[in-house]
């Protein structure tokens, strides 16, 4: 059964919109765990637009499952990770003007820089995942430079405008998952997944973990964190 990592970034987004102390993503992370989340994901962006350094430190201290820290592959972020010691790091591309992460890392192009950071993180006892598009060359490149895991970007599947395109993107996801498994990589998936589109991806098999944020937090606003997490966990595990 696949695991569910709950991303609480958007709780911090609401807080930062008013410049106040609430809602607190630290509390949201605890509630998600109580509802059955298998892990907590947070993205400390270079511009600190939502998650702040204090959030990372406090969630690290209070999380009872496992903490996955998403971050750019920079010296600053690697230093923070080595200090805070999350259970896992997911390296992602960042653009200052993007609303959310727009695509996967070009591992083949950035292999030297990424390998340097991967080696440092692994020496610090931190598992490293790379956020990549469902492209077989990127899967192979991730394996070659020593990643422990890959997180496959599901955005193109989620944004597909018609059934034919969606089916094509689902095939790409399936092939990337199979390739990752064959190479011995842990395979995760995320980005744009909702209560309405998760099941075909969960049915692929071979995906160890789904990291989902916006959809869960959006539903939690209406029905509460407990119900929102439990409903998504049922979909992830019961496909």
Curated annotation (Swiss-Prot):
Pathway: Cofactor biosynthesis; pyridoxine 5'-phosphate biosynthesis; pyridoxine 5'-phosphate from D-erythrose 4-phosphate: step 5/5. Its EC number is 2.6.99.2. Pfam families: PdxJ (PF03740). 3-amino-2-oxopropyl phosphate binds at residues 7, 18, 192, 213-214. The record marks 151 as: Transition state stabilizer. The active site is at 43 (proton acceptor), 70 (proton acceptor), 191 (proton donor). Belongs to the PNP synthase family. This is Pyridoxine 5'-phosphate synthase. The lineage of its organism: Bacteria, Pseudomonadati, Thermodesulfobacteriota, Desulfuromonadia, Desulfuromonadales.
